[in-house]
């Protein structure tokens, strides 16, 4: 396999293409014998790689032919020309049975053929890995177009990469095992050579050992080849670094270098062997590489000088296969997920370099970046969310900082060949972190890689991938600040992968001593670019390096956390990162790159980043500012390296810490001061980057791994300052920063002058910085960084309120104080607890503050609320800073409110930018009433105050259903509501308005929010109540608005019509409709807002009823309560139907007065009052019950009938569960009542008016004891009473008072019976109306449906009526029998009991059979519905559904009314009979 010719595809590898074009030949191979064929395919167009054979199993059919070699590119299978897609090839291969005919394209130059890790293993490949690494770099097919100049490196990268990619796919399953990774093919697609691939790039060249691919896979973290990191894998940082090291070591001035000089691409390939690889894969690779352990291995290799020696691509790989250990290292790190973070940084560096070298492939790089991002994300998730999230974030930050610190501090960098593990790791981590931040942005990683490469280049001379292609400025590509380049490249790569990579690619790559490189290579553009990038990075880094020193201490953790944060915090950091990068590019490109980048950062792909980019990146005037800002970022990064040094070496750590601290202090000042200082800082950090202390690398690989693991574990413990919750005082403390002025005064404030680029970056990174404060750029990183580990992200979803706290802690904390590593080290659990406590206090305080400062907040926030406005007037970064400050900048009030509601202000760091950008989009904040969690939407639409003062509650990623929170959160946080009722209301209003604003996000957001806040809570409250109801309803009614209004109506368990409309106007409108139709039911529903029964009771007392949003008259409510008592179920339907009227055809207009009369205390209006309410106890009911108790106490004969405590089974009891409850029916029917409104009979109204006691009667009717007594039981009781001796009745016990009470009870029951009868009449009208609707539906169905379908419809309707009546009949009979059994004498005759038991058994069986019929009927209903759905319009279908559901409900309701009336009549009879003896006396 080693001898196999390179698989690099000429057309893919620019460098390979030229020489390979002639050297390429087609080989026809025919295999026979059937599967398995014994070869492995990798790459494919879907991965942006050539379809290459990466491995040939020994002793396999493929090996027996001797014509097939690893690295061969498959052109045709079974005479079918391939389009280049791997799946296509796999299908064709699988479709081959006995014979398989392959046509492969082979390069005649064996030096290009990657060695097979599979065949050679680590040890076998070691000698060739150097070559293969180199080859990988140049053999990356995808590099061809992108890096033609660097043909050798690219060719190697391409061919090797393809192999490794194939291996990657082969070994994705091996990601879980380090060993397997070692033996498995790289995860990265051909284009995505992982750093592992990189590490074993030599091996890769030899054949992309499984180990490489395994590492690649692992680093990809479950990113499958489908995610294919394009050439990034081939040009993974590790591979690149290794190759470069080997190449440079062997020939620092070798032809490759000279080639680099003469041939920018070629030279780039050499000096940035890694770069060439990256270009093809840089987009993808950077992230995968970041994830890939090979990167770790790379820096592991960096420890080995020989490894770094990479002979010319054409030369045989002389360096020992050190890549293996590196890969193992990287893999183990990746396996641990912590070290993996490290490795990725290194790979990222390489990939960054690749990106830089990849200028031509920029578009492609972007695509790859996307893929890479996905892989990266997957990697973080799969290979180690902790690592990916924490490790990468921390490492990423450290990486950048390290680069910066190395460059700035001028810290001696180990021999490039001996890239410090920390350096590589940081680079990779940083890259990863940034990458994570900008997962969607693929480019970010690439820059990291290039920078790493630069640092890694052996001989102390970093090969800085030139970026001429991108910027057409080789100097820029090679900016001495390798770190800058990495940061810049990464920044760009993330956002402008192509641009950064392209310059690197385009520009000649020259191995320059690190010190020289930093200085000589640096040009104004370089500085500016690096600075800009550093600014962005810094912004990003600041997030990472909020506490440089602490980061240094916890550097590794931070890196891990940073990496993790990158993954999890990608949302915000990526945005910052991207924005920063955009800004970075903008300086050199006048932000044109930003535009290009914005393309990458498309609204669809990366909406948040897109908005952020637009917000800050689009300001061309700040390119310098960005540059200036960036150095501070680097300074922040310098601070980070401190943590990293912790990981790597105390000396390095201390040195870096000191340098970074100084640099950051000066640079933060400089950033604020101006571009020149920033540039100086940039130069410093570049120098720091250039100098990579060798001491930074552990003496041994194991040590590195252990250290990395430990760091990563700590980092994954979420022991990050970013995540550590800050006391509420931090919020308050940051309040200064929260203020715009303060924010601006902070690093952001300095940017106002540099509003465009610098502010942007500041905003992304510095925006966070503002929260930390001017002097605390690192802190800013913490706050702004808000990178959440995978776990944290998960928690953000599982415990949204805490996720807010998590974010908040970082955001707020940053300004007030710089976190120490210890803070960061704090366990996530501790941090979480702290967050909870803090958030609670903060929420409470914030709520109060909001109440006090709601309006001011609006004003303060309005500037931000109008994001477009803010964008134009104030740098988006300011807004974002505010957001980053979690609204701290906005104002303490807002922050408080945000804290109060979301406690996300700290979290906002990551999503603050998103929110800011979202706000800019003017998406109205959906005031998630102090909900326990909010999504990005919530953050954006936190509320009026929140929106205005972007209390960026990074509740959750926008992906999370923030809108689903609704006011649900209100019930969830009753305490909060209680504490901050005002705020809560405000929040509710905000939410409601936010919803309303959603329709008009641009203009309304601010105004509506302000208006609502201004409205303050009185009016909003009503609206909120309605809106909240709507929201709550959407929220499954679980979250009811605190106000009783919103309490679910028992009738429907749903909020009133308000549910569907945000405006109370709608409610009023509905109410009007109801008035025309049956306002009472609707009103009842609304009144029912109160806790079910309580609200019902309150219905009895209109004063108790909460004001209806629709302004329902309490009298009407009272009437409703009375009426509802009469007719509950249908009323519910009617109510909903009434609600529907506005939607559906409105009921015939009836004089509102007619329904209004319902105020008449009886259910004069269509007794469309729900029985549920009727069943509710009213004052009259209570009085009746009291009378009944008194009477029963004195006249035991009436106990069974009158005693409310006596439980008698009724027909409805047995029907329970068979048919949906009223609320369910209403929900299903969707309040679509097409029935004509029924006007209460004038007679009924008159009667009610005539009888002042009617209301009481109605109430009585609802809860009268006889309601709970079935007619059958009443008869039974009467019989039993008749059996009793008259003495009991006529005993002289009964006094006149008892007779009076009985008479009162009789009167009460009589009134109730009158109400029930009226309700029955109304019900009959409803039944008629429903039948009329059914007739209409039937006519329509008959016209549109086929005869057989129409027959099914008619049969179903007919059976529905029959089954319902059958169930009712059986239930009634069974209830009577059971009541009789329960009321048997103590010594009943055996015959009687036995007879009753037998009847009970038979009836029970019949009842069960009827239930089965009902189930069958339900199935038929679904069938009929499906049939009708194909014919009927939506409206007609809704009518049908309403008709069917109402039909059964009305039948049941009718039966229930009949039973109640019968029972009442029997009760009256019993009472009259009991009075007879007394009267006779």
Curated annotation (Swiss-Prot):
List of residues that carry Phosphoserine: 236, 318, 330, 935, 959-960, 962, 1041, 1043, 1165
Biased composition (Polar residues): 189-202, 216-226, 252-263, 431-441, 1001-1046
Residues where Phosphothreonine is found: 963
InterPro entries cross-referenced by the UniProt entry: ASD1_dom (IPR014800), ASD2_dom (IPR014799), PDZ (IPR001478), PDZ_sf (IPR036034), Shroom_fam (IPR027685)
All copies of domain PDZ, residue ranges: 26-108
Subcellular location(s) per record: Apical cell membrane; Cell junction, Tight junction; Cytoplasm, Cytoskeleton
Alphabetized SMART domains for the sequence: PDZ
Major localisation: membrane
CDD domains, per the entry: PDZ_shroom2_3_4-like
Tissue specificity: Present in kidney tubules and in the vasculature of many tissues (at protein level).
GO molecular function: actin binding; actin filament binding; beta-catenin binding; protein domain specific binding
Every ASD2 domain range: 1185-1476
PROSITE patterns, sorted: ASD1, ASD2, PDZ
Domain ASD1: 705-807
Biased composition (Basic and acidic residues): 1-15, 1086-1096, 1139-1148, 1173-1182
Protein function: May be involved in endothelial cell morphology changes during cell spreading. In the retinal pigment epithelium, may regulate the biogenesis of melanosomes and promote their association with the apical cell surface by inducing gamma-tubulin redistribution.
Oligomeric and partner information: Interacts with F-actin.
Protein name: Protein Shroom2
Taxonomic source organism: Mus musculus (Mouse)
Classification of source organism: Eukaryota, Metazoa, Chordata, Craniata, Vertebrata
